[in-house]
């Protein structure tokens, strides 16, 4: 990444904020978990306490509401789910153009792994981190790390 890309990433990051995140049962639309916190702050590990019943759902809808001062040509996410530091799953999401001085909501659906591949909550609890890298094209804006606790 060149210094121009880095300074563009720094500029976007300064004006980028997650306002809230919501997880819903994708089938019923019922809210499972909601947090009004800026999970985009880099250089710190965030925590999320999520109801254990989320592990029993066929699919989960994730809604991210964010604001940006700078425009982005191709806003996208690279999301890794790690268990004790090892990658279990990785997803790529692309939103596209985001206008300057806007607040946006991005919703995506994540389907559960087959039941035979699921681990129990007591094994996962505190051992799972979700590492989300936010990009504009290839320019890294920020990287968020959230440790999951099942309640």
Curated annotation (Swiss-Prot):
InterPro entries: Ig_E-set, PDED_dom, PDED_dom_sf, Rhodop-sen_GMP-Pdiesterase_dsu
Alphabetical GO biological process terms: sensory perception of light stimulus
Keyword Coiled coil attached: no
Keyword terms of this UniProt record: cGMP, Cytoplasm, Nucleus
Compartments, record wording: Nucleus; Cytoplasm
Signal peptide: none
Primary localization: nucleus
One term under GO cellular component: cytoplasm
Gene3D superfamilies: GMP phosphodiesterase, delta subunit (2.70.50.40)
Record-stated family: Belongs to the PDE6D/unc-119 family.
Subunit (UniProt): Interacts with Pde6.
Protein name in the entry: Probable cGMP 3',5'-cyclic phosphodiesterase subunit delta
């Amino acid at each position: 990444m060149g210094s121009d890309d880095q300074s563009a990433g720094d500029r976007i990051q300064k004006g980028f904020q997650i306002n809230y995140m919501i997880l819903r049962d994708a089938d019923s639309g019922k809210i499972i978990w909601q947090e009004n916190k800026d999970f985009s702050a880099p250089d710190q590990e965030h925590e999320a306490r999520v109801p254990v019943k989320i592990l029993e759902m066929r699919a989960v809808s994730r809604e991210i509401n964010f604001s940006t001062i700078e425009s982005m040509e191709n806003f996208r996410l690279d999301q890794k789910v790690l268990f004790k530091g090892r990658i279990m799953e990785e997803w790529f999401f692309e939103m596209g153009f985001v206008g300057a001085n806007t607040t946006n909501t991005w919703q995506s659906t994540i389907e559960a792994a087959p039941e035979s591949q699921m681990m129990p909550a007591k094994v996962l609890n505190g051992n799972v981190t979700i590492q989300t890298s936010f990009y504009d094209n290839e320019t890294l804006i920020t990287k968020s790390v959230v440790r999951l606790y099942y309640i």
